[in-house]
Amino acid sequence: MDRIIDSAATREDEAIEVSIRPKRLADYLGQQPVREQMDIYIQATKARAEALDHVLIFGPPGLGKTTLSHVIAYELGVKLRVTSGPVIEKAGDLAALLTNLQPYDVLFIDEIHRLSPVVEEVLYPAMEDFQIDIMIGEGPAARSIKIDLPPFTLIGATTRTGLLTAPLRDRFGIVQRLEFYSPEDLARIVRRSAGILNIDCTTEGAAEIAQRARGTPRIANRLLRRVRDYAEVKADGQITIEVAQAAMQMLKVDQGGFDELDRRLLHTIVEYFDGGPVGIESLAASLSEERGTLEDVVEPYLIQQGFLVRTARGRMATDKAYQHLALQPRERVSAFTDPEDLF
């Protein structure tokens, strides 16, 4: 199901993001602790004329992991090579990428948790010693040779750090977690994007869009484009708070940034499972959605905003969820209660 507030990138998102992507850290809005730390690391690295330590960036989709990698490369004054874990199928694919790097270049691997074990084995010495071992020939005549690599920086991005192997995770000297954005930072991003795209958007209109963007710049920019469409057809082209609210009503995105799937999830837990706890498999089956979709796309924002909690026994709707759905909380067994205490 296509969702207007899905944080996964569409082709339209990717095309637009290239045009509005900031180049410098000064233009990278939000994520202040990350910006401040990376600014120090980059300045120190340039002063020493070294390659920046390898960087792992993780967090939910749409928060700017790819954008941050472009900014880092730009600030370092080096080239960025972009690829993804699923694309690197064989050790030879990775070797080809690494041997074509220039000194101090940045190699960005998105979805790095999806690298195969064979490819990871090649990556370890490349990260540690700037060397790779490759096999020449076949059968009894096969032999291993070492190839020296120029100093480089690997930036890995992932939405699922739990799927990274410990040896790979431990080889990153810099680890940055991207958090959901505040409405204020998102409003600044909306205003900046509107200026670049020549969209007439008031401060109040930008704030209304930001409030419903689930803390995610990609969603904020997508909503901005859809509200622009509405403003051009149903209004005079300017995005005011009234126009933004009317457009959101048409898109069925409420003030909390929830769409029908979010509301269905909360309603299902509340109405069919008495508020929980309920296991993720049962929940996915009830909603006819994949477990991974719920865990990676839907739940993170609901949990971060306090509408849902994960416990050892399953998911539970909070009192805040009941309030959002205009329902009265029910008496329910605590997820932390010892079953023997019930008798």
Swiss-Prot record:
Residue numbers binding ATP: I20, R21, G62, K65, T66, T67, E128, D129, F130, R171, Y181, R218
EC number: 3.6.4.-
Domain notes: Has 3 domains, the large (RuvB-L) and small ATPase (RuvB-S) domains and the C-terminal head (RuvB-H) domain. The head domain binds DNA, while the ATPase domains jointly bind ATP, ADP or are empty depending on the state of the subunit in the translocation cycle. During a single DNA translocation step the structure of each domain remains the same, but their relative positions change.
Record-level GO BP terms: DNA recombination; DNA repair
Assigned GO CC terms: cytoplasm; Holliday junction resolvase complex
Family: Belongs to the RuvB family.
Record: residues binding DNA: R291, R310, R315
Subcellular location: Cytoplasm
GO molecular function: ATP binding; ATP hydrolysis activity; four-way junction DNA binding; four-way junction helicase activity
Keywords noted in UniProt: ATP-binding, Cytoplasm, DNA damage, DNA recombination, DNA repair, DNA-binding, Hydrolase, Nucleotide-binding
Functional description taken from the UniProt entry: The RuvA-RuvB-RuvC complex processes Holliday junction (HJ) DNA during genetic recombination and DNA repair, while the RuvA-RuvB complex plays an important role in the rescue of blocked DNA replication forks via replication fork reversal (RFR). RuvA specifically binds to HJ cruciform DNA, conferring on it an open structure. The RuvB hexamer acts as an ATP-dependent pump, pulling dsDNA into and through the RuvAB complex. RuvB forms 2 homohexamers on either side of HJ DNA bound by 1 or 2 RuvA tetramers; 4 subunits per hexamer contact DNA at a time.
Assembly and binders: Homohexamer. Forms an RuvA(8)-RuvB(12)-Holliday junction (HJ) complex. HJ DNA is sandwiched between 2 RuvA tetramers; dsDNA enters through RuvA and exits via RuvB. An RuvB hexamer assembles on each DNA strand where it exits the tetramer. Each RuvB hexamer is contacted by two RuvA subunits (via domain III) on 2 adjacent RuvB subunits; this complex drives branch migration. In the full resolvosome a probable DNA-RuvA(4)-RuvB(12)-RuvC(2) complex forms which resolves the HJ.
Positions of region (Large ATPase domain (RuvB-L)): 1-181
Residue positions binding Mg(2+): T66
Superkingdom of origin: Bacteria
A UniProt-annotated Pfam family: RuvB_C
Descriptive protein name: Holliday junction branch migration complex subunit RuvB
Classification via InterPro entries: AAA+_ATPase (IPR003593), AAA_lid_4 (IPR041445), DNA_helicase_Holl-junc_RuvB (IPR004605), P-loop_NTPase (IPR027417), RuvB-like_N (IPR008824), RuvB_C (IPR008823), WH-like_DNA-bd_sf (IPR036388), WH_DNA-bd_sf (IPR036390)
HAMAP family documented for this protein: DNA_HJ_migration_RuvB
Chain intervals for the UniProt region annotation (Head domain (RuvB-H)): 255-343
Main EC class the enzyme belongs to: hydrolase
Record carries keyword Acetylation: no
Region (Small ATPAse domain (RuvB-S)): 182-252
Gene: ruvB
Keyword DNA-binding carried by entry: yes
Catalytic activity line of the entry: ATP + H2O = ADP + phosphate + H(+)
